[in-house]
Design a protein with these regions (language model features):
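Residue-level recognition of single "structural anchor" positions
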Residues: 1-233
Length: 233
């Protein structure tokens, strides 16, 4: 092929300087340390620590559970579109987290995020979507489910209504307005609880993140839940 490669090609270590410090930095990411705390701990600049953060997290984005067995609760949530850190904005700036111009929730101002949580297990499926529709939901979940072993439980959104056919799995739907506010077996409370934890961490802990980095931060939160559950070393 007339090309050279080595063991680090295609990994976060490819063409990386100070490789001997990266393992220690990866441990800082697993612990959820800030950029400044991580930089001080491993002895690199704050700018390099930020670049390393996203170099590492990009490799975690695709590390999602596959062929899960059990109840997979699936629900969507939304994050306000953010151009944080951009030198040129494509829209008027918002100050102090103010509301976007225009009445109501314009689709262009919000980014849909799909979250699936395996009930009773520390496994999470997450995906930033361009639109919440059946095709994108199916693409996001197709590797996570296993026909005959996965039961998908969702709310009544139209994007979820044909998952039984598109994924070939058993589905259950829970609509609070129709079924009441509680159902001990079929519900999406585990997914909603994860939404709350995720939003609190991003909005309060990180003071918001740029939309272009949102997949990386979803992966980071997932990595920290693995670390808490003892699934990382």
């Amino acid at each position: 092929c007339s090309k050279t490669f080595n063991a680090t090609t295609g990994t976060p270590l490819s063409r990386l300087r100070d490789k001997e410090r990266f393992e220690g930095y990866a441990d800082c990411v697993r612990q959820g340390l800030s950029v400044r705390a991580s930089a001080a701990k491993v002895g690199v600049t704050v700018d390099k620590a930020f670049r390393w953060r996203h170099r590492f997290l990009q490799s975690v984005v695709s590390q999602q559970p596959k062929g899960v067995a059990g109840m997979l609760e699936v629900d969507e949530t939304y994050f306000r579109e953010s151009q944080k850190g951009s030198r040129k904005l494509t829209r008027p700036a918002r100050y102090r987290g103010g509301r976007a111009k225009g009445a109501g929730r314009k689709a262009a101002d919000w980014v849909p995020v799909l979250v699936g949580r395996v009930r009773g297990q520390p496994y999470t499926v997450d995906k930033v979507l361009t639109r919440l529709n059946g095709a994108e939901v199916t693409a996001a979940l197709k590797d996570a489910v296993k026909p005959g072993e996965t039961v998908v439980c969702t709310d009544g959104h139209s994007a979820f209504l044909r998952l039984d056919k598109s994924l070939g799995v058993e589905t259950r739907y829970f609509v609070a307005g129709y079924h009441g506010h509680t159902n001990k077996t079929f519900h999406v409370q585990t997914a909603n609880n994860y939404h709350e934890q995720l939003k609190t961490w991003i909005q309060r802990g990180l003071r918001g993140v740029a939309t272009k980095y949102l997949p990386n931060y979803l992966a980071w939160h997932r990595l920290m839940t693995w670390n808490k559950a003892g699934l990382t070393s």
